[in-house]
């Protein structure tokens, strides 16, 4: 895996991000990974976000994580989850303009707040073909958008998540079309400490299957 730091524009501000390129010669699928809530310490340095990106690269998928506006070295300030949707669109623009990316196979993974911000973009943007949600923090409008979206989806939660309990998610799961899998990891909480590799592998397998890739040896 090759890791590359970069900056990219979103309107009149610059955002920082990190590529995780797999060691492949042909164009690879790509997944944007959106981090949890910045007002509660969330950033692209989240151990769960990092584990997902590293595992995606092991599955021959390019991963891209970035800091939302106002986080780390990204310009701007917190936008209440609305302006951050523009950050996701800017990351998609960057991916589609980057050589070595298979533009027909682009996915998005959102963790908590990252899912709440990423879902409204992913369900509408034709460039995104697969969507994974980790402990998703969605508003009712986000669940409604998911209900109307036919793209393949994956959702995962921890049995000890008391912020967004899996029982709360189950009421939405039944109404979400093309939800390929809803997993609940026993013992894990909202922050996934000690379970990062497990959740990362589940997410990466979903994208690998959706992109018709073989598992790493």
Question: Language-model segments: which ranges?
Answer:
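Short, surface-exposed "cap/lid" segments of acyl-processing enzymes
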Residues: 24-65
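Acidic catalytic loop of the alpha/beta-hydrolase fold
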Residues: 159-164, 190-191
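N-terminal cap/lid segment of alpha/beta-hydrolase-fold proteins
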Residues: 1-26
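Alpha/beta-hydrolase fold nucleophile elbow
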Residues: 100-111
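Gly/Ala-rich beta-loop-alpha elbow adjacent to hydrolase catalytic centers
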Residues: 110-118
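Catalytic histidine-centered segment of alpha/beta-hydrolase-like enzymes
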Residues: 76, 188-200
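Alpha/beta-hydrolase active-site loop
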Residues: 79-99
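Short beta-strand/loop motif that positions the catalytic acidic residue
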Residues: 149-150, 154-157, 161
